[in-house]
């Protein structure tokens, strides 16, 4: 990516409430965008046509998690204390899609959930500081809790003497979980807390089961013995029982650099890199060690950015660029591998909005026009999935219909798009 500022190319408007999530997916043999809002509505968009394909109210309150878990299956998780799985195999329909599964879930905090390989990690049902793990059986969608109310703080406390963490002294908890990130290839779970603490765990979801040998003795009714008296006939049977163990959890990372600011964004990249953001101007790039629980063994790049109030961070690893969305509506693009402590923005984006012109009377009695550009709070960021450019060069003269199709294909197949959701319900696309 060069240093030219990405350009706003289109916006999608059908939500009446603040955007809570955005995700681009490949669905129904086309690139689609799924967006959700703070009143529980979901819209699936045709990106090329820039029009809704399906729209329904999935929850009564804010949708916190929105993820496609199979080709035609959507998982949603809302502040109405519910997690649902939907069948979205039908492209066009007026009604809500069939609801395949419903699970009551703790949503006292605004934490997301993580789904992977038929496992689900959620805030614990009895304590928002802890987490539960469920095993999902397909296709019936039967949920079995395999780890209940696990406390990262208790695990941390047991390992406290091994961790060089002076800023964490005196705490008796980490507060509620704000962000969950699961790294599937390494079975790692990273948690960001209300206190600003970050914890990394390794989770063995399938520990070796234990075989228990058992011998059962069955006594028959007593019969006369040839030596006099009574004897018993004993029938011995042996059996082996397989006892499954609950997931094994180990502490692999701990950092308190954000304390006392709550974690608002957490992103994991390849090569053991974790990027975290909080409510201030601080972004931290964690180069952690796989088998060390001491943050002093990690290389921490503590960066200052231009604006406070970090709402969302997404990363483009091909260009070493992170896009930081702030509450004030500004999106910064910065090089996360820069050696500078204060990151220079490669660019700053701010959504194009109509100018508001106000008229007032000055001291001489004349009218004065004031032009102001309104700011709208940014609520969500997402990068488009990678795609091939399908434009075909031809010398044949194109009809108007062909030109319209070509323009749609160009928008839909450009290298990368950055999507931003806003408080007024708009989703805006920027070409990178």
From Swiss-Prot:
Gene3D superfamilies linked: YVTN repeat-like/Quinoprotein amine dehydrogenase
SUPFAM superfamilies, per database record: WD40 repeat-like
Predominant location: nucleus
Example GO biological process: chromatin organization
Keywords: Chromatin regulator, Nucleus, Repeat, WD repeat
WD repeat positions: 14-55, 58-96, 100-144, 258-296, 395-432
Any GO CC annotation of this UniProt entry: nucleus
Name of one Pfam family that matches: WD40
Location(s), subcellular: Nucleus
Origin: domain of life: Eukaryota
Family the entry assigns: Belongs to the WD repeat ASA1 family.
Complex formation: Component of the ASTRA chromatin remodeling machinery complex.
Biological function: Component of the ASTRA complex involved in chromatin remodeling.
Designated name of the protein: ASTRA-associated protein 1
